[in-house]
A protein has these predicted regions:
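Short, glycine-/small- and polar/acidic-enriched structural segments
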Residues: 28-178, 185, 193-200, 210-217, ...
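Short helix- or helix-capping micro-motifs
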Residues: 205
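Residue-level recognition of alpha-helix termini/interfacial anchor residues
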Residues: 3, 138-141, 238-239
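Short, low-complexity disordered leader/linker segments with a strong preference
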Residues: 1-37
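Extended ligand-binding regions for polar small-molecule ligands
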Residues: 15, 58-62, 226-246
Length: 246
């Protein structure tokens, strides 16, 4: 009688242990089906944002229950437009973009809720090597800058003023070229003396022999809330369980 009880108990244990992997698999599959779909529009695709790409590749967002689609906007103005229009739930751009949208009377303000970078990630590139470069060397020179009012341009002008240069009087800053085209313009047209570039464009210019990195804007500007995640107020109110996982 005792032997029969032990046999029954052993059989029950075996069945329970065997069922565990299947239960776990079913739970995992069920969890995968319930991932919340989120479109994230980033201002640029650069090694500067490596932590974000690592999180995506390592599955950290999926672990948080998010099915993330990454789209590159190529400029804060375009990323902001994507968020306001609903093409993207989350925007990743300079904090200044949400301020501008608010000042323009946005009925559903876009709010910054998390910061990824705390320094500028771009570099000043010259046509020639300048091992003893000083910001004063930009006086009376032409520089390919960024969009007026954008974080890259504002930080650049802050550094100029910090070093005794008036951005409007002491040099010429060309702001007519699209964000993603300045490196090509610098390489193809030698009328400018310097350009401000993110990676990988800065390194590409060096490899091409068309330019040389002479200064880091991140080092010379200091700490600044350079790039942040943001979303519309209505989305943040309705989808708190989602954006808090970003």
């Amino acid at each position: 009688m005792k032997n029969k009880k032990w046999i029954s108990l052993a059989a029950a244990i075996v069945l329970a242990v065997t069922a565990l992997p299947m239960t776990a698999f079913a739970a995992k599959k069920d969890g995968e089906e319930k991932l919340a779909k989120v479109t994230l529009n980033e201002v640029a695709h650069s090694i500067f944002y490596a932590p974000q790409y690592v999180a995506i590749e390592e599955g950290y967002f999926k672990e948080e229950g998010l099915d993330l689609t990454l789209v590159t906007g190529f400029g804060a103005d375009k990323t902001m437009t994507a968020v306001i229009s609903g093409e993207a739930e989350i925007g990743f751009m300079g904090a200044e973009a949400s301020v501008y949208a608010y000042q323009e009377g946005a009925t559903d303000p876009v709010v910054n809720f998390a910061q990824l970078t705390q320094r500028a990630g771009n570099f000043l590139v010259a046509r020639e090597e300048m091992p003893d470069f000083k910001w004063e060397d930009l006086r009376d020179k032409k520089v390919l800058g960024g969009r007026k009012g954008g974080m890259p341009e504002m930080v650049f002008e802050y550094i100029l003023r910090k070093n005794g240069l008036d951005p409007q009087k002491d040099l010429m800053i060309d702001q007519s070229i699209d964000f993603g085209s300045t490196a090509a313009a610098f390489s193809g047209d030698t009328s400018s003396d310097f350009t401000v570039e993110f990676e990988p464009s800065a390194t590409a210019l060096e490899k091409e022999g068309a330019g040389y990195v002479v200064a880091s804007l991140g080092v010379d500007s200091g700490y600044v809330p350079y790039t942040s995640y943001s979303a519309k107020t209505s989305y943040m109110e309705k989808k708190m369980s989602i954006w808090q996982k970003i």
